[in-house]
Amino acid sequence: MKAVADLNLDRFMGDWYVLADIETPFDRNAVAPLETYKQAPGGVVETTYSYREGSSDGPLRERNLKGFVSDASPAIWGMQIFWPVKAEYRVVYLDDDYQTTIIGRTKRDFVWVMARTPSIDPATFKALLKTVQTLGYDLEKIRIHEPMRSLHATNTTINAKSSDR
């Protein structure tokens, strides 16, 4: 799975709303997840994963992670979930305006579809899901977060599961 070429790490930093994903063991109850990236010295990206637990009015939770940028490409990171494990984290799609992105793994076990805003145009979202499918992911495993879930509800072309998250 190829990472994007010529990623400008400075432009990539900031807030990214998770619109859809394949849930991990660490985010099963996550509602309205947000990833925030901040560059730190030594090729490190400080990552804050925040979300509401269980429902949109659930308690706010936050996890602090570290991304270690690969020497081979700024679009490939080792994301340290807990020491000493670093999970593969690849920016596999990024639009020219740095407004939408797809993060994937060569194992195709997890994927994140993200945007700078909590929701995007349904046609753009559908195209992103199609890209996820083209990358080899099973769309039946995709969890769509609100508010994209409501906007996507009438889509019958792509079969991504909607969840209460």
Give the residues covered by each predicted segment:
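A beta-rich soluble binding module of mature secreted/lumenal proteins
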Residues: 1-165
